[in-house]
Amino acid sequence: MELKLEGITKSYTKGKKRKNALEDFTLTLTEGVYGLLGSNGAGKSTLINIITGIIGRDSGNISFTDGNDNSFLSHLGFMPQGMDFYRNFTAKDYIKYIMALKKYSPDNADEYALTTLGKVNLRADADKKIGAFSGGMKQRLGIAQAIVG
């Protein structure tokens, strides 16, 4: 499998100023685990948000092995840095929400969510609101999110 980003550009407007977060960015990744390093404002979060479909790009192409612009989303998992979860969701509902975003079949969604939470030792807390979780529990929920995609 290969994820290819070619000529990715994304800019933001703040007041009257326009700033490029990414300009003609190109990268090819093969199967594996990767991390992004860079100074503040280098475009790391913008890049991840573009790859995962959270935000759009101004220009450029994204392809995954077969050339389909969006097929890679089902193969991609990530753990967000800020851990900004929906505090009023239960852990199980949050994982089911991520599954729905990733277009998982709703059949057996409860069972799959509970199994995934069990992998990170949160099955017993599946019906607790995320707002009541400790920092470590939120980290494990982030890992469960990455497992789902």
Description of each model-found segment:
Residues M1-L5, T9-D24, T30:
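A short, flexible loop at the N-terminus of ABC-type nucleotide-binding domains that lies
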Residues S39-G43:
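Walker A (P-loop) phosphate-binding loop of ABC-type ATPase nucleotide-binding domains
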Residues T52:
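Helix-to-loop junction immediately C-terminal to a conserved catalytic motif
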Residues G56-S74:
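Conserved ABC transporter NBD signature motif
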Residues G82, N88-L101:
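Q-loop/switch helix immediately C-terminal to the Walker
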Residues K96, A100, N108-D125:
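Conserved ABC ATPase "signature" region
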Residues K129-F133:
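Conserved ABC ATPase signature
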